[in-house]
């Protein structure tokens, strides 16, 4: 990762801490996601919840090494504007496709298959996002869902679903605010 991108990420960390509407993942979660993408060889990433693009930059920095792309979905116009500016500053515009809309409506319209999915949006809707995207995930795709410890009660249906689903193997990673990591085995 180039120094300018590291500086941008640090700037976005401070911005996120000072602006409640921008809930960025912690840096250790970003690093963990980056490592997962690199070692898995993921080439097509689906991100639900772009916010200001902080997590997207972590994902895009990793997937560009795999010669891949991030498709990210965000509904809020003001967040989209910030994210686009940040992608340009990170020189990652060609690696990221940002789609405006409600993920519940956008996911069914997506073409192609994904190797990696990161969910960090409306907690109660995580299960909807996964069910809608499931057929678009390749075998051995990784699904990561943020806030599995911090918002465990809001995510209880999602957590029960991924932990009991016959086509998934799932584990809680106690990093940041908790990351539920699932592998699509079927």
What are these regions, as identified by a protein language model?
Residues 1-116, 123-144, 148-186:
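A short alpha-helical cap/connector motif
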């Amino acid at each position: 990762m180039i120094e300018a991108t590291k500086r941008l990420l640090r700037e976005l960390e401070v911005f996120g801490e000072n602006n409640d509407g921008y809930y960025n993942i912690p840096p250790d979660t970003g690093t963990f996601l980056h490592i997962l993408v690199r070692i898995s060889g993921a080439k097509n990433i689906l991100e639900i919840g772009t916010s200001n693009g902080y997590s997207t930059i972590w994902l895009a920095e990793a997937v560009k090494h795999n010669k891949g792309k991030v498709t990210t979905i965000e509904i809020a116009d003001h967040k989209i504007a910030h994210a686009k500016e940040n992608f340009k500053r990170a020189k990652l515009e060609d690696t990221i496709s940002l789609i405006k809309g409600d993920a519940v409506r956008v996911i069914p319209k997506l073409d192609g298959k994904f190797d990696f999915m990161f969910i960090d949006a409306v907690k109660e809707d995580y299960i909807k996002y996964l069910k809608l995207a499931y057929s678009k995930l390749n075998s051995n795709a990784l699904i990561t869902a943020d806030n599995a410890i911090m918002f465990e009660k809001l995510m209880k249906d999602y957590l029960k679903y991924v932990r009991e689903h016959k086509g998934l193997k799932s584990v809680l990673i106690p990093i940041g605010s908790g990351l539920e990591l699932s592998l699509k085995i079927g």
